[in-house]
Amino acid sequence: MEIVINNISGLNNSFNNNNNSNNNDENEINFNLIKESIVNFKLWDINNKQIEYVCRLGSGSLCRVYKGRLNGKPVAIKVFSPIRFEEFKTEFLMMQSLRSSPFLISFYGVSIVEEPQKQCYCIITEFCSRDSLYHIMTDRLIEIGWNRFFQFSMQIILGLQSLHNRKPKPIVHRDVTSLNILVNEDWECKISNFSASRFNCLNTEYINSNNQNKSFAFCSPESSDFQDIDDDYTSLSSSITSKSDIYSFGIIMFELISRIINGEYSHPFSEFKDIKNDFQLLLSSKNGLRPSLPNICPEPLEKLYKQCVDQSPLNRPSCEEVIISLNQIRSFYLLPQTKKSWDNLVLKNKCK
């Protein structure tokens, strides 16, 4: 039985002590000005009275996430504090510009909610009941075989293709991780979390160097081509392109293949015990280190994985090329002798 909480401050009155300490006059924003300044905001503005907050699902450095209902329909609600206005604005501008795709999280609208002594911004999207791909892979009770691998991989790359082929400006996600791939009741993968995304990404971009939301294991080598500007920001190299997303997709391939063959989840780069922090991880990646697939990994999958995580972005395949390769590998897998051989790799883990 679901318990509806009409006042979300009753769940958690603040994001954290740091947010409270920063909740000063300069962070108090006139919300009427916000609605006027953000393109298309009014078209997507949802009256908060239409939204019911059911339960809190989790929280991160950027926002809190709730399960809720919009006019009786299950939804996910991301609540950003005032100091996270830029992240909210970026994600809204990205999501309202996306064309419809079955493998991108559906965007329903935005809302403004009042909490004690502050107002917060909300993004409302479809609710995915199976949580993230990461949570599915870490649950040993869920069986994942090669059919699921091809299903998940194809859905993710099709979602990326719809971003990279967007007209007139393509979108580079820049934070493709298994945590940002949500899975609905029908086992369909949905790319989510567009707060780090950018149009084109051909010019220099700026990111917060203290952003704890970034998953460094999925960062391409060119992502570490930065130089300090000041204490708060770094300048990213213009080399971050759609091929950086392909690298991240390759790391998700590693996660899935390792989970299938080993029977349990392996964090990317966890095999390298000398890597103690994110800086070492980024430096190691830049120097060519990659997570190692199990030595019994089928050769066609290993080849595609290595192409996706190639040191040079120019050598990585496009989404279209990955789709062709996945279809070819799946056809090869479905050959009776191949299927028997590959499926035996999974059966060995069940006997462990």
Curated annotation (Swiss-Prot):
GO terms for cellular component: cytoplasm. GO terms for biological process: signal transduction. It catalyses: L-tyrosyl-[protein] + ATP = O-phospho-L-tyrosyl-[protein] + ADP + H(+). ATP binds at residues 57-65, 78. It is an enzyme of class 2 (transferase). Its EC number is 2.7.10.2. One of its GO terms (molecular function) is protein kinase activity. Keywords: ATP-binding, Kinase, Nucleotide-binding, Transferase, Tyrosine-protein kinase. Gene3D superfamilies: Phosphorylase Kinase, domain 1, Transferase(Phosphotransferase) domain 1. The active site is at 175 (proton acceptor). It comes from the Eukaryota. Residues 51-333 form the Protein kinase domain. PANTHER family: MITOGEN-ACTIVATED PROTEIN KINASE KINASE KINASE 20 (PTHR44329:SF288), SERINE/THREONINE-PROTEIN KINASE TNNI3K-RELATED (PTHR44329). Belongs to the protein kinase superfamily. TKL Tyr protein kinase family. This is Probable tyrosine-protein kinase DDB_G0290471. It comes from Dictyostelium discoideum.
